[in-house]
Amino acid sequence: MAACGKTNKSHVIFKKVSRDKSVTIYLGKRDYVDHVSQVEPVDGVVLVDPELVKGKKVYVTLTCAFRYGQEDIDVMGLTFRRDLYFSRVQVYPPVGAMSVLTQLQESLLKKLGDNTYPFLLTFPDYLPCSVMLQPAPQDVGKSCGVDFEVKAFASDITDPEEDKIPKKSSVRLLIRKVQHAPPEMGPQPSAEASWQFFMSDKPLNLSVSLSKEIYFHGEPIPVTVTVTNNTDKVVKKIKVSVEQIANVVLYSSDYYVKPVASEETQEKVQPNSTLTKTLVLVPLLANNRERRGIALDGKIKHEDTNLASSTIIKEGIDRTVMGILVSYHIKVKLTVSGFLGELTSSEVATEVPFRLMHPQPEDPAKESVQDENLVFEEFARQNLKDTGENTEGKKDEDAGQDE
């Protein structure tokens, strides 16, 4: 008789093997959440082949780097990369007292057996999140942005330089540092504006409101617009846009303001009348893939990502080391008839800020990591909701490890 009961959820483990098979790194996830007050540490294990390592030491490093764009900028005498953070731990042979193992590490040590060594890498609170500026379709090379890399390698040099690490004995993994929506929302965003036109005794009033402060990626954003036209002019068009503001603060304080979604109505507001209209926008990367300079959440290789999430900065942190700061606002623009009626026009606009983020993930403390439910997957990005596309990753049940 088949056993009854609740089936435990499989826990995907991401692994990568060096070319010479001497070291294999295992991570329980690829996205590490910045809770503002603290950041989830990178916990994992390294499987070492003592025969292939042959007395070398095995290290694991965590690097945060800001890339300025295409690498050919180096010919101008400038560096195209700046390391914002670097840390390294020796995992083999073990040094010092072993720290308390996480539940994930306990399960991996039990499953993988001897020659498996745990490591724990932490993020300081001043680092930016993973973000990049989307290149144009014809651009080649690495994109401008912030990325994080975990690397495991074997070396017989105590303090090896990057170019002296044997590539065949090293393995690199890109991970992401991400932020999710805070548990509590701020006040409901709204804005009011008035304009006085020449030869009009009374103003044109505009009121804009959103239903909440934070919207999740892929969620429709209803924007309620009320136009009170006390002038003798005609409001010919109402256009509502979601604009993304990417502030590259690390090297030049450049601002990139890009509309990522828009809707408009041609319904006119005649003199001495009022119109209330709700327009719904859905900002998606799927509708902006060809546009250079759009900020995206950092991605790994050529897999899916989404529009960059709004940046939350911990109080007291220096903004200039945050790489790229991302924010959003709703812009409402009115086209108003001019002196010659329909033949000419002028435009007025106002803005309402909001946040675009991912929801809080399930509490990891509620998930139990059981060694019999571990599923090993070659390191590759998973699909995200924002893109409007669906791709499947390749999973490897790794039957050979079940013994």
UniProtKB/Swiss-Prot annotation:
What tissues is it present in?
A: Detected in retina (at protein level).
| Gene Ontology terms describing biological process | signal transduction
Q: What is its main location?
A: other
Q: Name one GO molecular function term.
A: opsin binding
Q: Which UniProt keywords apply?
A: Cell projection, Membrane, Phosphoprotein
Please describe what this protein does.
Answer: Binds to photoactivated, phosphorylated RHO and terminates RHO signaling via G-proteins by competing with G-proteins for the same binding site on RHO. May play a role in preventing light-dependent degeneration of retinal photoreceptor cells.
What does the sequence similarity comment in the record state about its family? Belongs to the arrestin family.
Comment field on protein domains:
The C-terminus interferes with binding to non-phosphorylated RHO. Interaction with phosphorylated RHO triggers displacement of the C-terminus and leads to a conformation change that mediates high-affinity RHO binding.
Q: What is this protein called?
A: S-arrestin
Which source organism? Mus musculus (Mouse)
Its lineage opens with: Eukaryota, Metazoa, Chordata, Craniata, Vertebrata
Q: Which gene encodes it?
A: Sag
